[in-house]
């Protein structure tokens, strides 16, 4: 079978919720496309090529036109829907091997870490992402993730400030909800 046929088969397995078969298929596709230990990049858009070259200090990589990273990412989302966060995280790790600068992959990884209770790793991963951030929405999410860490660590003052700060970059209902929760828990309003 050629790659296009395998991609269609992957999509059929995934659509019919045969996730193990879909996983085997995307692994087979990935194995077919790997190039002698050379770094690969499945970019979503041109800016990702620039980000990759800048942050990883190399132009020695293989640009792959097949969306292997998206296949792993979509499979991870299916596992997350089924509350299989360990398997989802594994697939997101593989997705990141194919696109090391795709913020969506990393944000999903942080969501898995939250569900797995891996708070230290959540904070570390989130902080590592700071260098890749170039949108207001992503910087806001960055601060919400750090705020989540402080909520879980029972440091509501820091969390409240970080949620407020995230809203300065991109207002979100999530941050508003968390601020309201913290205001109720602390018995006072958040300073402006």
Segments from the language model and where they lie:
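N-terminal alpha-helical interaction modules that lie
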Residues: 1-65
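Alpha-helical repeat scaffolds
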Residues: 21-28, 87-93, 121-132, 158-165, ...
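Boundary/linker segments of alpha-helical solenoid repeat arrays
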Residues: 33-41, 102-106, 133-141, 168-181
């Amino acid at each position: 079978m050629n790659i296009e046929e395998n991609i269609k088969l992957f999509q059929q397995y995934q659509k019919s919720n045969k996730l193990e078969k879909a996983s085997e298929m995307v692994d087979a596709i990935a194995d077919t496309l790997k190039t002698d230990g050379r770094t690969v990049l499945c970019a979503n858009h041109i800016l990702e090529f620039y980000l990759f070259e800048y942050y990883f200090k190399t132009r020695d990589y293989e640009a792959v036109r097949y969306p292997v990273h998206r296949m792993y990412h979509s499979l991870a989302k299916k596992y997350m829907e089924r509350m299989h966060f360990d398997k989802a995280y594994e697939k997101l790790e593989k997705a990141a091997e194919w696109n090391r600068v795709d913020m969506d992959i990393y944000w999903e990884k942080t969501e898995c870490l939250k569900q797995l209770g891996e708070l230290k790793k959540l904070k570390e991963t989130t902080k590592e992402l700071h260098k890749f951030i170039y949108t207001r929405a992503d910087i806001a999410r960055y601060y919400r993730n750090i705020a989540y860490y402080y909520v879980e660590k029972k440091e509501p003052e820091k969390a409240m400030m970080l949620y407020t700060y995230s809203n300065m970059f991109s207002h979100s209902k999530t941050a508003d909800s968390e601020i309201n929760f913290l205001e109720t828990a602390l018995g006072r309003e958040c300073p402006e």
